[in-house]
Amino acid sequence: DGDVHEIQMLTNMFASIGSNDLAALKEYLDSNGGNINDYVNAIHYLYNVTPQIFSPDTTDKVRQVNPDTTFSALGFGSGASANSLMAANMSTNVFNEMVGDTSLVEPQYDVVAGHWPTSYNEIVVVLTDNGGVSDFMLYAMGLRDPAELDSMVQQLINDEPIVTPTDGNKTFSYDEIMNVAFKMVNAADYYAFDPTYNVWTDKSSDTDFMRNLVNSGEELHISGIVQPRSGTTATALTPGLYYTPDLTTHLINGPAQTQIVQK
């Protein structure tokens, strides 16, 4: 009594692996090695894989929405900011990966339309406490005209007075949001073989190439819309668009089928 004893969870884990073998480590964790499930709610693996997601409408231009390229002309993208004012007021990331075990987050939210994702190509929309979404998210979803955003960015670059939309605070039905779709491509498919020089060339700056690639890409669609449950003091997900770890796994396995990898 009065003593707290040590549980050698990490010691036993490393002793059972014995080397820098990540596959063995994952197998150990997945098989409840050291009874680790008694001490954690979930084990979530993060991989350096970013889904390449585009607007399905390529009529006027090819618009990448993840990672977002809207502000690349200003010298920053989804991971950095050009000025502190923007950094303090917005994030250019609207897509995020959620935990695989949705039972950990489901009690915090009401499903107001559809359902939580059950397939790798499904995305859930997470609203704010009062049922809203940011205008930046609406541009990414194509519910606001992205040309408006392009115009404001260009005016900022040119140090011109910025003309903002006059129809702010728009509302959208759940059906309008549920009808949103995206296109996803594999990053390995950005490369095409050049037989003249016997090399693979990055074609991501070739508009016609990218338009064809996006048009033939995989479709991602909205499976549901969720909103923080009334009375919930803390939630696991910030407002945005969330895909499951199954999508990441799909992307990891995908390059094995591409020509650049097979060659």
Model-derived regions, located:
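Basic-flanked hydrophobic alpha-helices used for secretion and membrane insertion
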Residues: 1-263
